[in-house]
Amino acid sequence: MKKIILFSLFLLAGGSLSAQELRDGMVPSDEGLFPFVITYGEAAPAVDYSFLLDAPAGKDGFIRVENGHFVNDKGRIRLNATNLTAAANFPTHEQAERMAARMARFGINCVRLHYMDWPYGPENFPLAKEPSIFANDGSERNLDPEMLDRLEYLIAQFKQRGIYVNVNLYVARYQYHYKGQNAFNPEIQAKEREYAKDLLTHVNPYTGLPLAKDPVVAVIELNNEDALFTRYFSGNVRKPDWPKPSELKKLPEGERRAFFKTLEKLESDHWNNMRTYLRDELGVRVPITSTQVSYTVPSALEGMDYYDNHAYWRHPRIGVYWKQDNVAMVNDPNGGTLTGNLIPRRYAGKPYTVSEYNHPYPSFFGAEGQPMLHAFAAFQGWDGVFAYSWNNRMNEEPQGMEYFFSYAARTDCLAHFIACAAMFLRGDVAEDPEGVAPALPLKTVEDVWLTNPKRGGDIVSTIAKTSDGRFSNLTMLRHKTAVDLHGDPEVNKTLPKEEAGPVNTTCTGEIEWNNEIPGSGMFLVRTPNVKLFSGFPAGRVMDLGNGVSLVVGETKLGWTTVSLTSREGKGFAAKGSSLLVATGYTHNKDAVFTVEKDKDGKLTKAVSSRWYDWGTGPMMTEGIPATVILPSAASATKCWALDESGARMKEVPVKRGASGKAILEIGPQYRTVWYEISVQ
């Protein structure tokens, strides 16, 4: 009866339950889109969640590792984070102040300072080269005083707002022909130590402390996406007496094992020596890691303080002519990036972070990415998640998308960052209190590598995928999972063996991944203080729990992401306020997308374009027609459509439903992506 009432109310409001199917190659019409760029200036209280941060950053002492997690003197700490890439790390002082304030409003409490050591430009994509932290004097060694001053002022602003930093050291200096050689090249090793010393021991005039002694630093990464076990197989790192990768399988087992040990020792010695240098010579106290786990074998990382990983759903093929696979991860019944990369490479006993993650623009479904990651990161008990990237350019306040990975102007994604912060940082999504720990001894990893030599991080996923079902995708989606590198394989026989099904729900009952209708997947989060739907409604009523239900009308993609966050954390029936966000099709003004065809001339789900068809700001978006049923009394509930700054723009009528409960009907007529709800 409840569903019948909901359908009736929605139809009386003039809604449509027919979802427009996103067929292969379809590019929706821009008709009805409106400009909406979330403000870079002052914002209204309704969209300011900076109270989730504990300012100033570092007031409770240095972050350290205890019992496999990050803690400070106050207790456990999670890093709800983003990245700044390349010249975006060097804003003017005025821009730095606005940037720090804006990030804090979205509940971001850490920023990864990434790719500062090389001009980010034509080597990556056809845009003008911008400054790095090194002076343009040909030395590639001297820090640029102006860029260093800008960076240090930015860090001071972050600290004041309660935002920590992750210092990413070697990324792209000398570009990629040196990748991997730092494991055995003394000259490169010396330059890495020199850069670390210059950057970490310089006294910041705005904080009075060098980074090595400043608790604003949360963690330090030695290298980005760089490991001997990967670069050897890519062909750009090989000593004259080493076999070629193609020759490995032909060698006797003893020689293969000896070569594995050679690579393992070279790499682990380098990481351990750099960690010791930072600790003993520079006085660094915070956790240190080497590189991402997907780039090497776990035995090479044993000496590090925590583990880190990266993942992208449908990473674009970049160039003047680019291509993007335009598919929604919610339609992958196998778990997408979560089970394919992130969960099976989480090793037990140490903190785990994901310092880069994105569903890159112009994916029409990009808004699903961060909510799905943050919900599962909270459930899995991870220690940090970093949206990649806040910005990649020196234009710190873009009005549109300037690159595939930036979030600063990506309205459809950014508006849900508040729900992400509530789920992960505030802990509104509960962690699995028990979890499972499949055993995968380091010796097993080595033995599998000998039979099928490949880049290091792929070995763990290979073993996970060939298990007997006790380390299956379903296990990882239903239970907190951490691979025990020192465990007894006999333990694996006692783990639950999950059976396949179209609906996967976490053991806590708060997260549901539903593929009952193929091609119309749904991802739902049901907690007392955060409700989330992302996917293809297909005319269904979404019961989000605690008296909250959602019905979505016709959208341009037949798809939407909707989040509802309680500001006070007291639920949606009690006195207080909440933020409702509903997003859909969003892209640059005047963007031109081309539908790709396969070799047989059939349309595919890939979209592509040329850089000069990329379009410009402002971001154009659609308003989502939906009916939201709340547990609060209609007589005590008010709702307002908000403008780009979060200020009240127009009141939304609240209707009285069954038992006097509140019913909201939102839609494109309000020309907004977010709404404030108040219960008195």
Task: Kindly give the residue locations of the regions a language model identified.
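Sec-dependent N-terminal signal peptides
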Residues: 4-13
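Proteolytic-maturation and junctional protease-sensitive modules
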Residues: 625-665
